[in-house]
Amino acid sequence: MKKFFIGVDVSKDTVDVSFFDDDRMKSPEYLAQYSNSPKGFREMVKDLRMCCHGVSSEQWLFCCETTGRYDHPLCHWLVDHGMVVWRESALQIKWSSGIQRGKNDRVDSLRIAEYAWRHQDKMQKFVKPSESLSNLKAAFTHRRRLVEKRTATRCQLKSMSSEKGLSASVARMIVRDLSREIERLSASIATMDESIQEIIRSDSELDRNYRHIISVKGVGPITAVALIVCSGNFKAITSAKKMACYCGVASFRSQSGTSINRKASVSNLSNRQIKSLLSMAARSASRSNPVFAEYFNRTLSRGKPVALVYNNLRNKIITVIYKLIERDCDFDVDYMRMHSTGQRANESAIRGAV
């Protein structure tokens, strides 16, 4: 159990710090604001040592919100200096803080410190990702932005066909520039794809997991990389159920008393990019993967809605991928068919007995 809790509200240029001493305080206390840089971090730790009343740094717990890349310098610096860091969802901290009126960086740091103290039993220690995984995430994020720019440029080019009031020479000039921009972006995307493959090949663990994923027919390279990145190479999100929940393909019921009893549905609190990629993988697998195609056709023949069947396929793809990673093996169509047949036979026997 930790004794000294530090809440850090991180922004682009500064970090606001509050602390809570479990033995001597009844509520968290604000410390100061520091620059979001190694110099500021050194000053922060120096001031905290003066406030901790001799509590060893081994008994310290730093907690901050996941703010994208802004909190990475702080977390990496603290871990390099032997500190324990807990990165928590900003939404989780907000919902656990009760009714709030107004906010600022100082108040947020106080709330984060109190959250760390009250919920220390739920603490998940931050572990620095490997250099290869960090490079893969940066390259994949850059590729996604290039694709978004290309899509926007293509839409702009398409809209030129209905543009009115332009002279032919101006229209041709704009179309030419947009076409060149699309070609440039396509070349950059191809270059990033090559870089991503080089990063994967340079790390044996990444390469092994990547090969297991793409062995599932219907799951392409981009979906495989996205799953590796968002799961921390299957170390941050460690189970298929957690991944299904994170991607927004796990269904939840809403029931209360006799007035509320909604059927199970998926939540909008999800990573929609991964969900979109899984949707494309499910559609591809329903046509090209014999195991999933058989399930797709069989379930549709029972009158199930198409959207429900595709969502079930997304879940099955996640479950299969996690099993492949766990067992360190590739996808085997014959084994999956035999396993599915045996499972259906058991279900039929149970229904008959009932």
What are these regions (language model features)?
Residues 1-354:
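A detector of single, family-specific signature residues
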